[in-house]
Amino acid sequence: MNTVTFQGNPLHLEGELPVVGQKAPDFVLAANDLSPRGFKDYAGKVLVLVSVPSLDTPVCDMEVRRFNTEAAGLSDNVRIVAVSCDLPFAQARWCGAAGVKSVETLSDYKDTSFGK
């Protein structure tokens, strides 16, 4: 078990910390239309994964909006995907209200295994 410090307090993390250059484990998450998405769906692309608890929190909202702004200057070979535990329908609603079109949102609502 790994431990980090958060606001001066130890916080125990599940699993192992990633190592630079290590291949990330595959995942299955739900797209806004409820279809499954995994690494294979982004084959040949540079994939930037942004993990947030919920798009409806102020910091996460600001973070994903910023990634959306930055995405405008990236090549077509780059995909930015924000993963949250929000329901896919809530993600679609949030993207519409926030004007987010360059970041794809995927949901980990089924089993919350993505961050483990």
What name fits each language-model region?
Residues 1-116:
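Chalcogenol-based redox active-site neighborhoods
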